[in-house]
Amino acid sequence: MVGYFTLPMSETLIRDAYFLKQIDEEEPATDSASAATAIATGQKTDAGNIAWLTGDPADGALTTIAETLRSDQGFSIGVVSTVPFSHATPAAFVSHNVNRNNYFEIANEIINTTQPDVVIGGGHPDTYGRFRYLSESDYNALNSGDAGYTFVEWTAGVDGGDALLTAAETIDVTAGEKLFGLFGGEGGNFDFHQASDTPGNPSVTPGSVENPTLTEATNATLSVLNQDPDGFFLSRRLTWMT
């Protein structure tokens, strides 16, 4: 897609994708919501749409690859992101909405309807200072266990990576158990890491102990999803932390 105008993938030759020109002065390129939707569903759509048909019809929800693999093949599914879990890219694989900024609606669908087997991402209200990326009621449901997840969250002074990996070891995905990790720093995202200027001896200093690294979050997710003999699907996103 370029701008707000779409072409069905089935009608667009692969080679043509390299010659498409900007056709909307206000939208020189697609946004991450429609880009992720194209990857997750094989369907091009309007900028800002999360797995939803162009034009925003009432019945426009698009089935994602994660949903198809779960329903047709029995796969377990997970999303890992260094930005808030209800942001466009992770959300496009496990939710549906006409507006990427409807964070509460998107988070509610992920937590209560799609219910991926593993969700790890940013958006914790304590680190952001308010409820922006999920509602207080959904946060409380996660915290109390009512949402059906083993919940690991950003906690001052606690090593988030260790806590996440420890929790993952207790999950039996074949028994329907699920893991949710909610972290974040400034802006709701995981912390930036500081790379050392030491040629020949590379190292990275994490921004905080409370947030897991992407490696830790991924390893925790894989330790859960890999239990499924039918297979698994994982969407993994790295942004704004390196």
Q: Where would I find each of the regions flagged by the language model?
A:
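Long hydrophobic segments that form regular secondary structure
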Residues: 209-230
